[in-house]
């Protein structure tokens, strides 16, 4: 083809195309302008699903974090509002609703149930509105913090349990016996006990050596055995304290001495009745590496020594108990039971008494037998021997002049009183009753009661006169006192007791026994009735020795008695006027051989009383 023709065709083609697209270009321009005018839309735009997509993505991230944590520890989150939702959907019941204790999770807690409810399997339920998505991150952070706190708490428990298990394993490895096999647990740290077992870990060697000396002032027995372990030095203590102590007190004591924490020590009381435990302590006490201070505790010796075992097998002997009560002058049943039980740790027969099932029976029999012996011994004694023995039991000294000054103050001739008092002590017929007459507050009762305490007499009370046995104490008395006799008392005496005041034998009714024949002991009576001036009691005038106290008892400026009338005053009085009262039996006893002590059981001479 000719090149000129080819160029013409190209130009014609361009011209044709330009003419055809002219109108289209104008319409396209107009349309492009309309599109550009709508490029910026100022109308309110709807959110759509972008926020929900973001919340789902965040929830998935938290869910992955939770699953990663649950692979290590099986934890389940608590949803405190899930219970509220379930309760709100229920139909109301007739019963009144109860107040429930709900956990408070802070601001906007109600959105927690809508945002992310995590069940035990780790799944999540639906999401709420746009407002809930704004706080979803905060709620998720709170859940993660709660999980971390629970993980830390569980970890601390695991570490503490692991430490204790490690220490117990080390103890068992070193001594071939578990710590719990040697001790009995005390749940309360304030429970006191004399014997304690201690296992200490991690203390320094020099402090353990120093504890040997520092603990001696607190203990009657101390045993220390030291070993080395992977935790450092381990020490085993067996302690018998002088006084009962609690775990808290002993813990503070070891913290000061060994400078260790309470987690590094075990403190429990030993098993006192376990033969394997006692054998273990007895065996290691003979070890060359053990430090011993004091004598072996009785609870170990009792189970490991043949002599102690024979003593434990010894049956109860009532005669030894009676001998003990007689030597200590115990005749009251509660006193005998209490004091003999206290001797169980020292006396084998007392320990056997505690093992008996008939303790009440034995106590009654012991008290009754002691009374029999004491009464028979009293009847064999003369008045002089009895007074001498009673005054020897009074410790201290008094002034006999107080009694003489008091009699002079009341206007009584001392020589006349001394003669009557001598006849009273010797039981002269018709001179066997001394009466003190006077108005109130003159010292009558103080005068006779102090004499009664000094001579260990008995007291009669007319309030018991309706009973046939109100005079029964006269059977076991060397002297008796009837205080504040009224007209009814004198009428009774005038009717029934004339022979008794004479000092002749009378028949005395005894409880649970047949009437016995006795002579009334010397009798002191105080009264406000002028019995010697009343003709109604004329038959008693010859049987009574009467002295009148007309003056009130003297007092000092402080309101205290100016004259001291007590058992010490009477002790000095009898010592001063012993010969004048013709109480010479004590002097005769000093010239002869001393009487042998009473024995009601076959016992050795060196036996403990």
UniProtKB/Swiss-Prot annotation:
Chain positions covered by the region annotation DNA-binding region: 146-313
Main subcellular location of this protein, as a coarse class: host cell
Origin superkingdom: Viruses
Binding site for ATP: 438-445
PTM description: Phosphorylated.
Entries under InterPro entries matching the protein: Helicase_SF3_DNA-vir (IPR014015), P-loop_NTPase (IPR027417), PPV_DNA_helicase_E1_C (IPR001177), PPV_DNA_helicase_E1_N (IPR014000), PPV_E1_DBD (IPR046832), PPV_E1_DBD_sf (IPR046935), Rep_E1_papillomaV (IPR016393), Znf_lg_T-Ag_D1_dom_sf (IPR037102)
A single cellular component GO annotation: host cell nucleus
Gene Ontology molecular-function annotations: ATP binding; ATP hydrolysis activity; DNA binding; DNA helicase activity
Subunit structure: Can form hexamers. Interacts with E2 protein; this interaction increases E1 DNA binding specificity. Interacts with host DNA polymerase subunit POLA2. Interacts with host single stranded DNA-binding protein RPA1. Interacts with host TOP1; this interaction stimulates the enzymatic activity of TOP1.
Family (UniProt): Belongs to the papillomaviridae E1 protein family.
Name this polypeptide is given: Replication protein E1
Organism of provenance: Bos taurus papillomavirus 6
Lineage summary: Viruses, Monodnaviria, Shotokuvirae, Cossaviricota, Papovaviricetes
């Amino acid at each position: 083809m000719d090149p000129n023709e080819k160029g013409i065709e190209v130009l014609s083609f361009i011209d044709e195309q330009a003419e055809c697209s002219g109108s289209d270009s104008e319409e396209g321009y107009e349309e492009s302008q309309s599109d550009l005018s709508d490029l910026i839309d100022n109308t309110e735009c709807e959110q759509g699903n972008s926020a929900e997509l973001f919340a789902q993505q965040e929830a998935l991230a938290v869910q992955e974090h939770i699953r990663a944590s649950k692979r290590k520890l099986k934890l389940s989150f608590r949803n405190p509002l899930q219970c509220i939702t379930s309760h709100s959907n229920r139909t109301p019941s007739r019963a009144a609703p109860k107040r429930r204790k709900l956990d408070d999770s802070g601001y906007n807690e109600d959105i927690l149930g809508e945002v992310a409810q995590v069940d035990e399997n780790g799944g999540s339920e639906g999401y709420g509105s746009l407002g809930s998505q704004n706080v979803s991150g905060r709620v998720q952070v709170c859940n993660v913090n709660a999980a971390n706190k629970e993980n830390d708490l569980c970890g601390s428990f695991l570490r503490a349990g692991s430490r204790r298990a490690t220490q117990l394993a080390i103890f068992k490895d070193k001594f071939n016996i578990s710590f719990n096999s040697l001790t009995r647990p005390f749940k309360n740290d304030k429970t006191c006990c004399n014997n304690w077992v201690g296992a200490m870990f991690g203390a320094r060697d020099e402090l353990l050596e120093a504890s040997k000396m520092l603990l001696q002032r607190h203990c009657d027995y101390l045993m220390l055995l030291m070993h080395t372990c992977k935790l450092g030095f381990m020490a085993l203590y067996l302690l018998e304290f002088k006084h009962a102590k609690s775990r808290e007190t002993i813990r503070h004591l070891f913290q000061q001495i060994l400078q260790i924490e309470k987690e590094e020590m075990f403190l429990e009381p030993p098993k006192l009745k376990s033969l394997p435990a006692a054998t273990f302590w007895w065996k290691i006490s003979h070890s060359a590496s053990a430090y011993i201070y004091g004598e072996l505790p009785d609870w170990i010796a009792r189970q490991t020594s043949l002599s102690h075992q024979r003593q434990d097998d010894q049956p109860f002997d009532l005669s030894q108990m009676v001998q003990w009560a007689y030597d200590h002058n115990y005749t009251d049943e509660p006193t005998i039971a209490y004091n003999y039980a206290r001797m169980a740790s020292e006396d084998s027969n007392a320990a056997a008494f505690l093992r008996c099932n008939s303790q009440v029976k034995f106590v009654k029999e012991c008290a009754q037998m002691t009374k029999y012996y004491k009464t028979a011994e009293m009847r064999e004694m003369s008045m002089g021997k009895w007074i001498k023995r009673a005054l020897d039991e009074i410790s201290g000294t008094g002034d006999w002049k107080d009694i003489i000054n008091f009699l002079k103050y009341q206007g009584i001739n001392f020589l006349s009183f001394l003669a009557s008092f001598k006849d009273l002590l010797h039981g002269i017929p018709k001179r066997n009753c001394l009466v003190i007459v006077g108005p109130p507050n003159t010292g009558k009762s103080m005068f006779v009661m102090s004499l009664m305490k000094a001579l260990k007499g008995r007291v009669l009370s007319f309030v018991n006169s309706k009973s046939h046995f109100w005079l029964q104490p006269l059977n076991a008395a060397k002297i008796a006192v009837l205080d504040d006799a009224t007209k009814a008392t004198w009428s009774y005496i005038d009717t029934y007791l004339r022979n008794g005041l004479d000092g002749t034998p009378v028949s005395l009714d005894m409880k649970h026994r047949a009437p016995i024949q006795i002579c009334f002991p010397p009798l002191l009576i105080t009264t406000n009735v002028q019995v010697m001036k009343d003709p109604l009691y004329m038959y008693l005038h010859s049987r009574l020795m009467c002295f009148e106290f007309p003056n009130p008892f003297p007092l000092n400026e402080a309101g205290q008695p100016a004259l001291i009338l007590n058992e010490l005053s009477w002790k000095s009085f009898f010592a001063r006027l012993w010969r004048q009262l013709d109480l010479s039996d004590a002097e005769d006893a000093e010239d002869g051989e001393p009487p042998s002590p009473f024995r009601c059981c076959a016992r050795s001479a060196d036996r403990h009383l």
